[in-house]
């Protein structure tokens, strides 16, 4: 998501944002740390091994430096969900070559769950290798134009044309590939306004992208349509689709289940309700954060990309 900025940019960003009053001064260093972590993950992507988990006969979870990917193989060709960071493309292609059930069928289809570059950074490289990119229309719009990452107060340039989805949809698109049916469905704005889920029916696999950060407080992109309420509604949609055997793929973190997603929903709802009550009572963002609305969850959820205070601030601002 932030791979085109360097470490010095991030340090300057945190200082400038705090000085300008764009974010509470106490959160500036934490915001900078989040950005630095994302940049480092991108830089390390070429050297980060991809872990493979077999989800079904011909469906695999691929986990590397960026967002979680899913690969379906078979006689109709490969279907890959998300493309990690650009430097990861050689490793991704190597894994696909190893797992592919029918190399003669060609590279196949790449589906983006949303627009952030830890999920779309490999688009251009995989497109050059022959993949056709599918996504919700807003993903093409955001990849093809300059964007602002509001939390980090930074503008990002448009991605190269080769990274743009060639086939887009507004609400839903259905595919039949390799003996299974795949639904691609647009969530209402949630983590961003580009989020979709991909449901692979026979395999009982549901990829929900960054609607779920499994084991961590989520990042919500408030500048591109994200909100706490939207994330909660999207999680509820996913829960309605899943059964106790569904393999639910989060954008980040380990393979999930319906029970795990239910716990995530409970956390989101509890923090939202507390922050909403503080805000309704007249608390400023800094005052609401100081009341520690996430405290009961911090031991489990507070060690990831988003600090408890950063997450509480996002909740406050997107209510």
Feature roles, as predicted:
Residues 77-78, 85-87, 174, 181-270, ...:
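Metallo-beta-lactamase
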Residues 97-101, 115, 128-131, 236-243, ...:
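Sec-exported extracytoplasmic/periplasmic mature domains
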Residues 51-98, 196-200, 205-210:
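Conserved beta-strand hairpin/beta-sheet module of binuclear metal-dependent hydrolase folds
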Residues 1-18:
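N-terminal secretory signal peptides and thylakoid transit peptides that target proteins
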Residues 81-83, 108-115, 134-137, 207-209, ...:
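Active-site neighborhood of phospho(di)ester-bond hydrolases with catalytic His/Asp-centered motifs
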Residues 25-62:
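C-terminal segment of N-terminal export signals and the immediately downstream linker at the start
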Residues 11, 15, 283-319:
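C-terminal regulatory/interaction regions
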Residues 16, 98-174, 193:
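Active-site HxH/HxHxD metal-binding segment of metal-dependent hydrolases
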């Amino acid at each position: 998501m932030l791979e085109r900025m360097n470490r010095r940019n991030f340090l300057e960003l945190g200082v400038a944002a705090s000085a300008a009053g764009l974010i509470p001064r106490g959160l500036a260093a934490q915001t900078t740390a989040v950005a630095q972590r994302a940049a480092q993950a991108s830089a390390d992507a070429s050297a980060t091994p991809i872990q493979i988990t077999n989800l079904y006969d011909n469906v695999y979870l691929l986990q590397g430096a960026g967002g979680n990917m899913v690969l379906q193989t078979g006689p109709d060709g490969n279907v890959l969900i998300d493309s990690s960071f650009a430097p990861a493309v050689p490793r991704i292609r190597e894994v696909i070559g190893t797992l592919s059930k029918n190399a003669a069928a060609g590279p196949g289809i790449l589906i983006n769950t949303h627009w952030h570059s830890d999920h779309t950074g490999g688009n251009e490289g995989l497109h050059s290798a022959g993949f056709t990119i599918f996504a919700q229309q807003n993903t093409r719009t955001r990849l093809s134009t300059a964007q602002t990452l509001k939390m980090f107060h930074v503008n990002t340039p448009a991605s190269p044309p080769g990274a743009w989805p060639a086939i887009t949809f507004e609400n839903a698109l259905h595919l039949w590939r390799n003996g299974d049916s795949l639904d691609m469905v647009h969530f209402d704005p949630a983590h961003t306004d580009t989020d979709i889920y991909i449901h692979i029916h026979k395999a009982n696999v549901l990829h929900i992208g960054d609607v779920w950060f499994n084991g961590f407080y989520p990042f919500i992109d408030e500048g591109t349509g994200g909100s706490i309420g939207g994330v909660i509604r999207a999680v509820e949609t996913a829960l309605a689709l899943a059964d106790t055997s569904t393999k639910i793929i989060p954008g980040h973190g380990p393979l999930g289940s319906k029970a795990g997603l239910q716990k995530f929903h409970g956390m989101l709802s509890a923090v939202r309700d507390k922050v909403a009550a503080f805000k309704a009572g007249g608390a400023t963002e800094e005052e609401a954060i100081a009341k520690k609305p996430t405290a009961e969850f911090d031991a489990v959820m507070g060690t990831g990309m988003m600090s408890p205070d950063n997450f509480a601030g996002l909740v406050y601002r997107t209510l």
